Regions:
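Beta-strand-loop-alpha-helix segment that lines the small-molecule cofactor/substrate pocket
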Residues: 55-62, 66-113
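Predominantly a Rossmann-like dinucleotide-binding segment in NAD(P)-dependent oxidoreductases
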Residues: 112-175
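Short active-site oxyanion
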Residues: 16-20, 54-56, 158-159
């Protein structure tokens, strides 16, 4: 997610300068270093220690969200955290407590909030053209099989964390 989605977005944004990337997969890391002409690290903590970073994007497997985010906060670095915030509520509360203690900025990325279809639904609901809403239903018309870490409950949280985080967030956002 990070190297294929967030890195191009950072590079194409005039307000950001990509200085380094971290990935334990040496092949992916080497490819990213060559493609984006940046420093690369196989260890996120080493990157945070050696680079002068204002912000890190934590797009690691979900079971690393807590330690990577806490590591950034401890080093005085703000965090843009890929959803879900954590695999468990206790971890999310620990992240929030660390954010409050350190005063660092934290943004949990919920990309579907800013998609055009969501904005259109938001405007329609705000217009009250439909009257009082009693139910919102969201369906998936297709599903992809995950064979990587995201499919495993202990690493990615399984389907609920992959898709459910989007659906629950949208319901909260729209209501």
């Amino acid at each position: 997610m990070g190297l294929n989605y967030h890195v191009p977005a950072i590079i194409n944004h005039p307000g950001f300068l990509l200085t380094a990337v971290a990935d334990p997969d040496v092949q992916k890391l080497q490819s990213a270093k060559e493609k984006y002409q940046v420093k690369g690290y196989t260890d996120a903590y080493v990157m945070m220690d050696q680079e002068a970073l204002d912000l890190v994007v934590v797009a690691s497997p979900h079971n690393f969200h807590l330690p990577h985010t806490l590591g950034a906060f401890e080093r005085g670095i703000d965090v843009f955290l890929e959803k879900p915030m954590a695999n468990h509520m206790a971890e999310a509360l620990e992240i929030k407590a660390a954010q409050e203690k350190t005063g660092r900025k934290l943004m949990v990325y919920q990309p579907q909030r800013v998609m055009p279809d969501t904005e259109a639904v938001r405007q329609l609901l705000d217009s009250q053209l439909l009257g009082k809403i009693y139910m919102i239903k969201r369906t998936m018309s297709s599903f992809f099989v995950r064979t990587n870490w995201k499919a495993y409950l202990n690493q990615g949280g399984g389907t609920l964390n992959i898709h459910g985080a989007h659906y629950i967030d949208l319901l909260l956002h729209l209501t």
